[in-house]
């Protein structure tokens, strides 16, 4: 595996890989876990070579968020990626991605509104900007993202469609299902922030979501189920709920009656100082 930190050697490395066959990109912020490695393994099923980016993007963190505390473990991440057969690791510093005088921002409206877009103003502008840059830098034939960040995936697909991106084309931006711990908690780098007691309590989140979905499928009013879900999250050990909402899986517009239209349940909640997100389909399938 080749590790590069500067743009010029990245371009040379990408050109060599692309000459040998299709190239897949898995963008990450590092602190890799089994969820990330699942993306890498899926990427290998679609391409001759896999490139992974590790960049803790300062533009997607708010003023009071966890940029400085976000876990960084490059040496360990390199070892994991090498063991998975990754061909290229792109690990730039912030000054390489955003040099002096940088003045361009990518903003995607609509799907970025509400949910995490409301709770974290400016977050998706930072996401769209860095992913657009990564796509331009690596020129992948396809890119893979985890469905835990469902809204992020919708933003990236909208950006690719609206900007007529060729590499990757919007249809080659793939979502990979959420990877969960044995107790159901969605895998996340931020789980490392949790104390043992918080980690045990965090497993109540997916259980409460599953119970709410089961109640909706049983015909109970969605508003009642969401209200009960919020209370169960708090009683399970969380300190607050940023949102618990039903949205259309594609457009992300609010859904009031999941019995009559496709819906997905989205939740963001805080346990201690840690913010966790999750989402699940509301369907009998």
PLM segments and residue spans:
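Short, basic/aromatic-enriched C-terminal tail that caps enzymatic domains
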Residues: 4, 254-255, 264-285
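Nucleotidyltransferase catalytic core that binds NTPs
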Residues: 2-238, 247-251, 273, 280
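A conserved acidic, glycine/proline-rich C-terminal tail/linker
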Residues: 241-259, 265-266
């Amino acid at each position: 595996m080749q590790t590069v930190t500067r743009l010029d050697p990245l371009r040379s490395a990408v050109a060599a890989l692309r000459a040998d066959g299709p190239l897949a990109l898995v963008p990450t912020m590092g602190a890799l876990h089994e969820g990330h490695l699942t993306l890498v393994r899926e990427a290998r099923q679609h391409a001759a070579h896999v490139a992974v980016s590790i960049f803790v993007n300062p533009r997607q963190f708010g003023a009071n968020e966890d940029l400085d505390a976000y876990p960084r473990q490059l040496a360990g991440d390199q070892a994991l990626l090498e063991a998975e057969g990754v061909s290229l690791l792109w690990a730039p510093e912030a000054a390489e991605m955003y040099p002096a005088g940088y003045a361009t921002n990518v903003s995607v409206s609509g799907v970025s509104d509400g949910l995490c877009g409301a709770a974290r103003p400016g977050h998706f502008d930072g996401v769209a900007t860095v992913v657009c840059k990564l796509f331009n830098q690596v020129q992948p034939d396809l890119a893979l993202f985890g469905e835990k960040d469902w809204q992020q995936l919708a933003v990236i697909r909208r950006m690719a469609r609206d900007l007529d991106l060729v590499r990757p084309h919007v249809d080659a931006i793939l979502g990979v299902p959420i990877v969960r711990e044995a107790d159901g908690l969605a895998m996340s780098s931020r789980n490392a922030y949790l104390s043992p007691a918080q980690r045990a309590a965090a497993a109540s989140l997916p259980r409460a979501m599953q119970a709410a979905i089961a109640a909706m499928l049983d015909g109970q009013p969605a508003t009642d189920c969401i209200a009960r879900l919020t209370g169960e999250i708090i009683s399970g050990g969380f300190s607050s709920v940023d949102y618990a909402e039903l949205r259309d899986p594609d457009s992300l517009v609010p859904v009031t009656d999941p019995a009559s239209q496709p819906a997905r349940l989205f939740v963001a909640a805080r346990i201690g100082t840690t913010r966790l997100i999750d989402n699940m389909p509301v369907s009998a399938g």
